[in-house]
Amino acid sequence: MRAKRIRFAAVMSFVLVLAAIAGSTAQARTESGAAQVTLTMWIMNNGPEPVADMKRILAPFERSTGINVNVQLVGWDVQYQRITNAAISGEAPDVTQAGTTQVPYFAALNGFENLASRVNRIGGRKAYAGGIWATTQLAGKPGVWSVPWFTEARTIYYRKDVYKRAGVNPQTAFKTWASFRAALLKLRSVRNVNGKPIMPFGQPGKTAWDLVHHIMPFVWGAGGAELTKNHRSSAIASPQAIRGVKYFSDLVPAGVFLKSSLEKNAPQVEEQFKGGQIATWIGGPWVLATVNRADDEAWVPEARRNVGVAQMPVGPTGKFYTFVGGSNLMVFKSSSHKNEAFRLIQYLSQNTVQRNYARIMGMFPARLVPQRQEGNRNANSKAFYQAIKHGRTYAPIASWGPVENAYKTRFGNILDIAAGQGRVSYSRSAVVNELRAAAREANTLLSQR
């Protein structure tokens, strides 16, 4: 998950608004009756200055409620183990940020509060898009185990100038799988811009931690799924899933792919788009936050001036999907200040607070109302809003992490084979064999639940 920083002055302009919001519902003393409560909150690397930004956002809450918040930074490289240890041992903060796909695993540890009796105070399920609300769940364990905090989705970025030179109409290019492929093939006619080589498309490969996020939308668009409906078996080798994966991997040998991108992770491919090496890629909303930032020197001028965003193409089912993720907030059972902890979550769930914090990070708010407000800012933001409305996440099972890793490895193998780097020639049977292997590995993991 990436977050982008907006200048300090922009952050400070939000604080006066936040103060008014916090004051409208605040009480001078905590619900427990204590004169002073200090909550400990774990956050991850939500931008270059995550703690400072968070403290500025929380200042009105602290001032108006008398509740102090000790914001502690826990890096993404260690947060999984630290949250796990805290949930098991009971030596934990009050509130923690958690990645959306991690919530089921953490909830299964029995170290977190069921927030089902509290979430109506912030609008409950109806305040969120379906795919986002799904991230609060754990299959087989009724309850609400987290509250969505901020959201990211993946959708298509493209170069308006390159599409125009190639005679490709963006209004029709992204309508269907067929039109998307045809557009990419037509873009091959533009070999360079201002003397710099450019390729129609680029996406990360096996080194990308989020590779599954990039490919699963095509599986879903073909009518496939990651698991069967009862979550007991893998569905990644179904005919529909095979069709979705193969549509994506077929782009590699079609002459539209910058093959060097397959050796890179997502941030590196983002740099390729900003640097003018590719005309199309699938990325998150944080890139939009950098378009007008002069200090982001990765952008070449012609790319910066011509950024377009479009929805994912409609698949054979007549629908399009995108992956939605982000971060949620969870309350530890061991907290001595659960009421105050949820007051903090209520504050962070207010529409204006959500919108302002999301802008700092270059993400989207988690709630529908501020999402719609962000979507109305411009055409590019609207494309992300539409993506979120059609967003989907993975099955809410505790063992999803290992299953995702198994899929990631096999997806990476397929892309390598498609690029001519595998031990076998690229064909439908090669794709099927890798996906069947992924299914076997996933089924072994699922049988251990």
Q: Which positions does each model-derived feature cover?
A:
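Extracytoplasmic/periplasmic substrate-binding proteins
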Residues: 44, 57, 103-105, 207, ...
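Helix-loop-helix "hinge/cap" segment bordering the ligand-binding cleft or interdomain interface
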Residues: 59, 120, 138-213, 222-263, ...
